[in-house]
Structures are given as C-alpha cells and as structure tokens.
C-alpha cells in the first residue's frame, strides 16, 4: 500500500509498505543515486532519522533487524547504510546490525546512530558498557574534530546534541581501527570513525530538534562515495579552527542557552 506523508508541508514523500515488512520512503528530492538501507533496531526514533535522510534527498528502505538477510540487502545494491538507534545492548539486541557492518564495511558508507555507534564499536572488537550517567532526552555540549560527519563545522565552538542512552563505547577499549571524533566534558565518547572505511557513528541523536547541525551532518554522509576514505580524500582534511563561522552572535548564544533551559525544565 502507498501512503502520502502526514506532513506534506515539510515532506511530500511516498511510503510503500511491502509484504516482507520492508518500508520504502522515496524522497521528492531524490538524487537518483540509489537506495539508502536503514536497519531498524526496533526504535521509536527510526522514522525521525528516516525523515531527515529523505529531506536531504535519500531514498530509504527500512528493514527490522531480524526480518532481513545479508543476501536480500545485497540484492538491493544500496549506496549506503544507516544503523538506527535502539534499546538494549548491541551484542544481544541488534539483530543483523553487526553482520551488516562487518559485511558492508569497506564497500559502502555506513552511519551509526546511538545504538548504531555501539554496534560499530563491538563489530570491530570494542567494549560497550555503562556510561556512568543516564540520559533520556537531555542535551549536552560536545567537542568534535571538524571532519567526516562534522565537516564544515567549526571546532572552536561546541555543538549541542540530544542524548538517549545509558551505555557507551569504553574509550580505553576502542579498537585501533577506530578513532574518537567527538566527546562530552565527562569523557563519554560521542563519535567514532573507522580509520580506513567510510564508517562513522555518533552516540547522540542528530535528528532531534534539540540537536544542532543534523541536516549538515546527514548531507555530509550522503555525499560520500565508495567504502573507503581514500575514495573521499577531501572528507578528512584538517579543518580550520578559525574563520567567520567560529564566532557566535549574541542571538545564537541566547538561543543555545534557551534550548538548554528548556531541556533541563523537562527533566
């Protein structure tokens, strides 16, 4: 069956629900590059992530993490893949997500969000355990390296991210093939990137209205080609830490503080 978007003012997409459970959402701004596969880890935010992707021109096909095989995914010839947020631990509750990262890593770009970062961590031999703090819809300021997903963003000004997690990648056990790309003041890892493959992940939710630069980050992800950074040499250029974009206007500072105040009032 086919459905129009419930919010045609912001997203005039076409949604198709198939008998095998896959959900296809075709972007009105589709680039014609092919399909973005999303593995749904049974999370309530999956379709928020999908909407952000579609708004940036992706044609998204969503599969539940226990309702699809690698062979089926291969047959779609996806141009990239997203591992969604989800409850539980990646070793027990992520279904095919780990296998997807291991199989498609080095072939196509992969983006992990929240549990998706944890899946990337354990897929390459890292450890995921308690973060020492519980966040559910709370915002934090985070530093980032200005490359990959964060390309084009100033490294001089922390960005706001919305967090929904109690687990995290353990920084002292991050595999050698991964590097930290973002963190909060407490030291909790907020971003990881594979050193060779076009695989990047964030622990927070860039699709949240309370997070900053979600569209820019997704746009960066969708621009990547192939499975290695060598095929995207511009992406990991050392960012400039100074320039017009590094300073905040007083209105931006007020807006940032207001968002933090609102988030705190809801806790």
Segments from the language model and where they lie:
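Short, charged N-terminal beta->alpha structural module
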Residues: 32, 36-56
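Catalytic beta-strand/loop cores that center a nucleophilic Ser/Cys/Thr
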Residues: 148-197
């Amino acid at each position: 069956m086919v459905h129009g978007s419930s919010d045609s003012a912001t997203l005039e997409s076409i949604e198709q629900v198939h008998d095998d459970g896959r959900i296809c959402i075709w972007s009105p701004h589709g680039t014609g590059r092919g399909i973005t596969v999303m593995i749904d880890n049974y999370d309530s935010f999956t379709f928020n992530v999908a909407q952000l992707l579609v708004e940036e021109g992706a044609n998204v096909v969503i599969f539940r993490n226990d309702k699809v095989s690698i062979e089926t995914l291969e047959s779609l010839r996806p141009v990239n893949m997203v591992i969604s947020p989800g409850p539980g631990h990646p070793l027990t509750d992520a279904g095919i997500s780990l296998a997807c990262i291991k199989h498609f890593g080095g072939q196509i770009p992969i983006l992990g969000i929240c549990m998706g970062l944890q899946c990337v961590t354990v897929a390459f031999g890292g450890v995921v355990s308690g973060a020492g703090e519980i966040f559910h819809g709370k915002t934090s300021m985070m530093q980032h390296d200005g490359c990959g997903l964060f390309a084009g963003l100033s490294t001089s000004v922390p960005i706001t991210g919305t967090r929904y997690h109690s687990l995290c990648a353990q920084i002292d056990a991050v595999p050698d093939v991964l590097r930290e790309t973002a963190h909060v003041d407490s030291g909790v890892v907020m971003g990881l990137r594979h050193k060779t493959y076009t695989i990047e992940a964030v622990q927070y939710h860039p699709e949240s209205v309370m997070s900053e630069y979600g569209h820019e980050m997704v746009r960066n992800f969708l621009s990547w080609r192939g499975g290695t950074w060598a095929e995207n040499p511009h992406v990991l250029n050392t960012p400039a830490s100074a320039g017009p974009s590094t300073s905040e206007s007083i209105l931006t500072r007020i807006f940032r503080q207001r968002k933090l105040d609102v988030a705190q009032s809801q806790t």
